[in-house]
Amino acid sequence: MKIHEYQAKAILAQYKVPVPRGHVAYTEADAETAAKTLGGSVVVKAQIHAGGRGKGGGVKVAKDAAEALELAKKILGMTLVTHQTGPEGRLVQRLLIEETLPIERELYLGIVLDRVQGKPVFMASSAGGMDIEEVAAKTPELILKETLEYPGLSPYQARKLAFGIGIPAASVNAAAAAMTALSKAYWAMDASLAEINPFILTTDGKVYALDAKITFDDNALYRHKELVELRDLNEEDPLEVEASKHGLNYIKLDGTVGCMVNGAGLAMATMDIIKFAGGSPANFLDVGGGANAEQVKNAFRILLSDHSVKAVLINIFGGILRCDTLATGVVAAARDLNIQVPIVVRMEGTNVEAGRQILLESGFNFTVGADMWDAAQKVVKLAA
């Protein structure tokens, strides 16, 4: 689960990471009031779940409250397009009005899971204020790493990183404290990503999290009811939100071949084979091993709500989800939803013959794939 910058900063502040003074604004009047409260020049920052906001025109500096009001009028309600939003962009519905700070240097701090080690890794770099992926690709030597152990970064690791990215001796303790606090927040909140970019050093030697991003492990949210309340459904794809209500794992993609599969591994393999056959998947949809006919019907309804879908591939290996259960749900969906796109079905496993018989006797013109490759070729041809 993603949250907004201002929400991430509020969490970091609870763990004693220094953040600039700021206020969230939902209206133009809120923005003006916030700017007056802060006094002096302020930064007006669009709040969406995507990076690259500055380059897209979503971050502007105002010299006073009057200019902040004018900027708020322009940014609130705009569709902000960045390299992470795609061409459709995101509607800006809230702003962060924040004090400006005298920046001496921009640095980077971040924590992600190292899948090779199976442990979180703390990264720090002197190249802050830019995409860390670009830094990693072009100048990987600028990224320093320390493996994390519970409950967080040790004092010697924090100081090592602080000195390593060129923090002056007078500011090392403050920077190390912020790093340690960030690592503790990561552990305590069951985060999958915690990032401060840029982490700044001011002209008077202080450090601040000038921007912050935290992503949480969805599977751990049951332990953090307070985090669930931070979820902004307006920032999520409506179909993905609807799928989550029915216990379905759905991610919308840009292709034309709709996919319904049981099991994440088989779902990814299905998308791969569709690409290999010359097509493009419209979604990732894992109905899970324990799905019933009603869930299958809901999955179909969600899948077909995407009007870019020109054909559907159902790829099921019957285990806990028996093939006859899947077929019953598919037929029910076809009857209730007035399906107009061609459907290719490939089933193997428990009760496969019964499942095929249900499809055969349904009266609908389902295309049967002999195997995955045959099914992929057929569905790509039908979607063309």
Swiss-Prot record:
Domain ATP-grasp: 9-242
Pathway assignment: Carbohydrate metabolism; tricarboxylic acid cycle; succinate from succinyl-CoA (ligase route): step 1/1
Cofactor note: Binds 1 Mg(2+) ion per subunit.
Root EC class: ligase
SUPFAM superfamilies, per database record: Glutathione synthetase ATP-binding domain-like, Succinyl-CoA synthetase domains
Record Gene3D superfamilies: ATP-grasp fold, A domain (3.30.1490.20), ATP-grasp fold, B domain (3.30.470.20), Succinyl-CoA synthetase domains (3.40.50.261)
Family as reported in the entry's similarity comment: Belongs to the succinate/malate CoA ligase beta subunit family.
Protein name, entry field: Succinate--CoA ligase [ADP-forming] subunit beta
Organism: Solibacter usitatus (strain Ellin6076)
Gene: sucC
